[in-house]
Amino acid sequence: MVKVSLDNVKLLVDVDKEPFFKPSSTTVGDILTKDALEFIVLLHRTFNNKRKQLLENRQVVQKKLDSGSYHLDFLPETANIRNDPTWQGPILAPGLINRSTEITGPPLRNMLINALNAPVNTYMTDFEDSASPTWNNMVYGQVNLYDAIRNQIDFDTPRKSYKLNGNVANLPTIIVRPRGWHMVEKHLYVDDEPISASIFDFGLYFYHNAKELIKLGKGPYFYLPKMEHHLEAKLWNDVFCVAQDYIGIPRGTIRATVLIETLPAAFQMEEIIYQLRQHSSGLNCGRWDYIFSTIKRLRNDPNHILPNRDQVTMTSPFMDAYVKRLINTCHRRGVHAMGGMAAQIPIKDDPAANEKAMTKVRNDKIRELTNGHDGSWVAHPALAPICNEVFINMGTPNQIYFIPENVVTAANLLETKIPNGEITTEGIVQNLDIGLQYMEAWLRGSGCVPINNLMEDAATAEVSRCQLYQWVKHGVTLKDTGEKVTPELTEKILKEQVERLSKASPLGDKNKFALAAKYFLPEIRGEKFSEFLTTLLYDEIVSTKATPTDLSKL
């Protein structure tokens, strides 16, 4: 066994040794063990320099795009990978053959139980965009998964008892989404810098649960977010190889589905599958983050200004091209092509509005099935039956055998002109309203927020922020008033929205709308542009102590 030193490793939180969710006896101390810390410290020390280099490369690309010296295209240096028809992904893994309906949500204990009890095939437990990364959310997410995998997650609240509907081996397959490469976990420092949040989330889950999941016959499986280059996928593959070797399980046991949710990654889909080869379980269309990334990377180009967010749909030219290329790529390489999120939630007090929303979900899933997707996402258990009803028409567990004939060019992926697209005052109001509501909830520790009958995550607020930055930067003209979008206009409407939302808040003066607005304002005035809202806001939810925990007592 490799000897790992914990010298210069600082854990800046107390480790709770008391069980929180009785009757389970699992504590945070059972997760943050000395041997688990040694494992994640080894991964961090081995791979963190490469992680930082790859993040710097993103900014190199951005500078080239901004200068006009480079346009996104398929990489000439990897043409041999794209042009070689002989390589394939691995044989489908147990528990991942039928993925027609996947449910997603943060690793809160009650939501985890509800998701595992839902009529779905797989469950993406999310440490990323639908979770606010407070220490408790992240570490108790690990506790909850540890207990679920061992059939000891049942618990009671004063209002309700939560119980699994049977043995977890017979329930939906768990797929964990760790935080992206750009994020860090500031409650644990290694060699004077915060540990990679990706390695923290992946490492703790894998170390404690990989062998238990193998016994169950399904896992360990992951979703990988926010990648922008195939070398970022190679980095994950290297992490997987070291992790599997370390605990003594065969390479290829891990499987990972990559979310194609950044514009640069859309030009490298085949390379991403290739880099993960023995660990690949396909690609997924992360629609809202993809829109966010498209605006972000093309934000300084006046030829790529998107209209009001409700006019950017999956049938918009650049979105349709990305979906078609993803399905064709995945099926040629023998892996799953997963559809995107239906964010709707039931509207209990308005049957007519609810029926309209559910019809929209059904039509969206029919479009995905017809295009060739092998399954799709839902945000709420009530939507699972709709997705099931649509995808049962495949007649098989997946439709990887179906390779749609289409040719998608680089120009197609960059076709952001939307016929009859408009930018209006209502578009500004909507972006500010949704962005503020999401950021305020996130600052209070909630990353999965119902807004206007949709279950929203961080991608929603990111689209709001990017659109407003872009509209101000390019001084677009509003269709309804003929007024130019200026920093003064967006600031004025922001103040109006903060006042309205603060007055309506059930928290009274304990709401965090003013704090959210403080961070939002420079972005929507076009004065600065942060890579991610979550990293911009993160320090507000970090709660460290001055004296590190004595690791010898773990």
From Swiss-Prot:
Its EC number is 2.3.3.9. Keywords: Glyoxylate bypass, Peroxisome, Transferase, Tricarboxylic acid cycle. It comes from Saccharomyces cerevisiae (strain YJM789). Its main location: other. GO terms for cellular component: peroxisomal matrix. Interacts with PEX9. SUPFAM superfamilies: Malate synthase G (SSF51645). Pathway: Carbohydrate metabolism; glyoxylate cycle; (S)-malate from isocitrate: step 2/2. Malate synthase which takes part in the glyoxylate cycle. MLS1 activity is essential for cells to grow on oleic acid as a sole carbon source. Two steps of the glyoxylate cycle take place in the cytosol, the splitting of isocitrate into succinate and glyoxylate, and the dehydrogenation of malate to oxaloacetate. However, the formation of malate from glyoxylate and acetyl-CoA undertaken MLS1, occurs in the peroxisomes when cells are grown on oleic acid. InterPro entries: Malate_synth_C_sf, Malate_synth_sf, Malate_synthA, Malate_synthase_CS, Malate_synthase_TIM, MS_C, MS_N, MS_N_TIM-barrel_dom. It catalyses: glyoxylate + acetyl-CoA + H2O = (S)-malate + CoA + H(+). GO terms for molecular function: malate synthase activity. It is found in: Peroxisome matrix. Transmembrane segments: none annotated. Belongs to the malate synthase family. A motif (SKL peroxisome targeting motif) lies at residues 552-554. This is Malate synthase 1. PROSITE patterns: MALATE_SYNTHASE (PS00510). Gene3D superfamilies: Malate synthase, domain 3, Malate synthase, domain III.
